[in-house]
Amino acid sequence: MLKSAVYSILAASLVNAGTIPLGKLSDIDKIGTQTEIFPFLGGSGPYYSFPGDYGISRDLPESCEMKQVQMVGRHGERYPTVSKAKSIMTTWYKLSNYTGQFSGALSFLNDDYEFFIRDTKNLEMETTLANSVNVLNPYTGEMNAKRHARDFLAQYGYMVENQTSFAVFTSNSNRCHDTAQYFIDGLGDKFNISLQTISEAESAGANTLSAHHSCPAWDDDVNDDILKKYDTKYLSGIAKRLNKENKGLNLTSSDANTFFAWCAYEINARGYSDICNIFTKDELVRFSYGQDLETYYQTGPGYDVVRSVGANLFNASVKLLKESEVQDQKVWLSFTHDTDILNYLTTIGIIDDQNNLTAEHVPFMENTFHRSWYVPQGARVYTEKFQCSNDTYVRYVINDAVVPIETCSTGPGFSCEINDFYGYAEKRVAGTDFLKVCNVSSVSNSTELTFFWDWNTKHYNDTLLKQ
């Protein structure tokens, strides 16, 4: 029984509510034991390396010299958004007011369970050492960003050895900014780094890392007719199973769906989640594919607006590659959101856009897109430009794995020869028009992404947003 839970706290405004009382200390033996489910959490759970690495070495090919490195990263592990937290708290309230003794998969709730959202001020925010439920939690966004910085130095440190001053770019989302700052902290005090905070408001127009926010034509509910075809009866199965174990509980399919988010965000905040153990492996697979479907048709190749939106950043990336010999800065690091990265990868063509995902069943052999592989919390997409003898090449590294361009990968380390790459890039953006497709002029006069080139004179420092 969970008599300590107080509905007035849970139902209070998520902005103004106070701290939820603490329960017992987390069981440290469980922390770090659930990594096998990370790929099934739709990108809401902790960072993990891209599983489909094809066995290609991440190292720079022999006798080659790196010329430029670009990185577009997602913010690190975080607490749920306000809207998602409302759903989680609604389900938590139902559990906390259950008057019986919990049995079966929910029996852990009998033992003074401590709800992981202890303070609603943490909603939307990065998980840190300070706000984590357990100080031993290895999955905080803070620690992830600092580990990423150390990995960056190990892989590319020589690129910044003689470049002690350079810029790092972030959207003005608080959690993206925090990730960028923790990354900078992880680099140490050797560098003089200028953190440029770029607006993600629609008024930013094209001069943003978050182009979909500047797109009035963007439809959050696009392709719902396709998504509704997906069989979600497994959710009612979860609810029925738990209700059968606990008479009078009355969980619904909505509660069952909420448990997946609860599982992911609790791991981010605590280091493990007993809620995750209520699912069968089949249920995790079905949920994961549902997330793949939603992403593919609403922020990926299945939505025709996306390719134009992603072209805003991809065009800037290609321009930087072409200017690598004249630019003093050789490393370009940016932090933003998962949607922006998915748009970017869609335009690049890394995500297959030739075979639409089916909503009729869970495909296995035909499914090449897995949302969480590309955008777990703390995701990172590197663009490498390197020279071997007299030839220059480009390749992509996604979450620690080299992911070749399918039609252009005959160079060293399965890279793409530079002129072939530029030709490929032209084809990828042919027919795209971010400004026109999105009707950007209705919200902004900004028609070009310029912050990579004018940061030293404009000094971007937009007000941080709690989102």
Curated annotation (Swiss-Prot):
The active site is at H75, D338. Keywords: Glycoprotein, Hydrolase, Signal. One of its GO terms (cellular component) is fungal-type vacuole. It catalyses: a phosphate monoester + H2O = an alcohol + phosphate. Residues 1-17 form the signal peptide. Its EC number is 3.1.3.2. Disulfide bonds: none annotated. Pfam families: His_Phos_2. Induction: S.cerevisiae has 2 types of acid phosphatase: one is constitutive and the other is repressible by inorganic phosphate. Glycans are attached at N97, N162, N192, N250, N315, N356, N390, N439, N445, N461. Belongs to the histidine acid phosphatase family. This is Acid phosphatase PHO12.
